[in-house]
């Protein structure tokens, strides 16, 4: 098994863009698969990354072997959408490493986050400059999180999820506040009940932070199964 772990544009060690969208990030995923000449590629995307994965799968069609969506909700049209109130600010400069790491937070917050994983992610999310320490991400990517764009993305991705040509599986944190059971049921029906919805016990939205071993076990099981089974045929 060959793993490629990449940062979407504007995040981590990737360069910043003038504008951001799930479509742009999805195209980045396709480009990596092509450049690396990956055989039978499987994309795993968490939260926003799941949306980007759906877009990548929609343009890659059968060139993508599989897509595993991790705690990404596509809501029924009748559900009330979440309210967004993000304020775009320039990344603050912190005096030292200890101070900036103490400011690292999950959104949404959750209990039982494993400290060693939080510490690892925090260290990978910061950079040193002449004045001190700051976050790596481009704060402007947060502009896509507003009520209008959220509803627009939901409508687009309902159609895209229905039309995917690759194998799809969905992992959901059993205690996730982002991905309620109603959305899981709705997504299952969108895919004609041919793709599994797997609830990870005791997991919240950031599954890799509170239930990492359960997440790894679920991913390995899916990938091994896909390598030895045939996909359900669409009616």
Question: Model-flagged regions — what are they?
Answer:
Residues 7-12, 74, 204-207:
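Alpha/beta-hydrolase active-site loop signature
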Residues 128-190, 196:
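Conserved serine/cysteine hydrolase catalytic core
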Residues 1-5:
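Conserved small/polar residues in nucleotide/adenosyl-binding loops
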Residues 45, 49, 53:
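Gly/Ala-rich beta-loop-alpha elbow adjacent to hydrolase catalytic centers
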Residues 54-58, 65-99:
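Flexible "cap/lid" loop of the alpha/beta hydrolase fold
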Residues 8-45, 217:
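Active-site loop/oxyanion-hole signature of alpha/beta-hydrolase fold enzymes
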Residues 91-152:
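Conserved alpha/beta-hydrolase catalytic His-Asp/Glu region
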Residues 203-212, 216:
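Catalytic histidine-centered segment of alpha/beta-hydrolase-like enzymes
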């Amino acid at each position: 098994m060959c793993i490629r772990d990449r940062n979407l544009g504007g995040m981590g060690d990737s360069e910043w863009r003038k504008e951001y969208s799930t479509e742009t990030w999805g195209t980045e995923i396709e480009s990596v698969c092509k450049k690396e000449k990956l055989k039978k590629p499987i994309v795993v995307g968490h939260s926003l990354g799941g949306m980007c994965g759906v877009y990548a799968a929609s343009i890659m069609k059968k060139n993508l072997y599989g897509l595993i969506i991790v705690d990404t909700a596509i809501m029924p049209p009748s559900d009330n959408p979440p309210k967004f109130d993000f304020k775009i600010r320039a990344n603050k400069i912190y005096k030292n490493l200890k101070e900036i790491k103490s400011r690292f937070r999950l959104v949404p917050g959750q209990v039982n986050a494993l400290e060693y994983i939080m510490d690892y992610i925090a260290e990978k999310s910061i950079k040193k400059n002449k004045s001190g320490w700051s976050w790596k991400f481009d704060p402007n990517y947060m502009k896509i999180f507003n009520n209008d764009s959220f509803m627009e993305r939901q409508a687009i991705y309902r159609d895209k999820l229905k039309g995917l040509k690759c194998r799809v599986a969905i992992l959901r944190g059993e205690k996730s506040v982002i991905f309620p059971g109603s959305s899981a049921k709705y997504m299952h029906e969108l895919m004609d009940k041919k793709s599994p919805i797997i609830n990870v016990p005791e997991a919240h939205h950031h599954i890799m932070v509170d239930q990492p071993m359960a997440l790894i076990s679920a991913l390995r099981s899916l990938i091994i199964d896909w390598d030895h089974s045939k996909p359900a045929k669409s009616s």
